[in-house]
């Protein structure tokens, strides 16, 4: 089995990639996917530490977080589709303008 440090390093790399995606991308879909990548990176770190400490409670928490993330994906994509149907764009710069 790989040491915990490898999993934590991979988690940090995935989180950094997700953060770069949030900060540099302009479409709502890519920002949404980057946030999900960051959430999965946090889950990976939590599972790695739980395995190192022999605690099963954290794995249960990760399962609950994954369930909530699935609901978040469904709601988030529905909102993005509704915005696209109304505005015909998912560019967040275009969505920032207030129109009555």
Curated annotation (Swiss-Prot):
It is found in: Cell membrane. It is a multi-pass membrane protein. One of its GO terms (molecular function) is NADH:ubiquinone reductase (non-electrogenic) activity. The chain crosses the membrane at residues 3-23, 29-49, 63-83. Gene3D superfamilies: 1.10.287.3510. Its EC number is 7.1.1.-. One of its GO terms (cellular component) is plasma membrane. Keywords: Cell membrane, Membrane, NAD, Quinone, Translocase, Transmembrane, Transmembrane helix, Transport. GO terms for biological process: ATP synthesis coupled electron transport. It catalyses: a quinone + NADH + 5 H(+)(in) = a quinol + NAD(+) + 4 H(+)(out). Belongs to the complex I subunit 4L family. NDH-1 shuttles electrons from NADH, via FMN and iron-sulfur (Fe-S) centers, to quinones in the respiratory chain. The immediate electron acceptor for the enzyme in this species is believed to be a menaquinone. Couples the redox reaction to proton translocation (for every two electrons transferred, four hydrogen ions are translocated across the cytoplasmic membrane), and thus conserves the redox energy in a proton gradient. NDH-1 is composed of 15 different subunits. Subunits NuoA, H, J, K, L, M, N constitute the membrane sector of the complex. This is NADH-quinone oxidoreductase subunit K. It comes from Deinococcus geothermalis (strain DSM 11300 / CIP 105573 / AG-3a).
């Amino acid at each position: 089995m790989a040491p915990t440090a490898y999993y934590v390093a991979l988690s940090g790399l995935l989180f950094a990639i997700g953060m770069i995606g949030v900060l540099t991308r302009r479409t709502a879909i890519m920002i949404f996917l980057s946030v999900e990548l960051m959430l999965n990176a946090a889950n990976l770190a939590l599972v790695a530490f739980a395995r190192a400490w022999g605690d099963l409670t954290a794995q249960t928490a990760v399962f609950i977080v994954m369930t909530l993330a699935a609901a978040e994906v469904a709601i988030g994509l529905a909102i993005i589709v509704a915005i696209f149907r109304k505005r015909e764009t998912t560019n967040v710069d275009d969505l920032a303008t207030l129109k009555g």
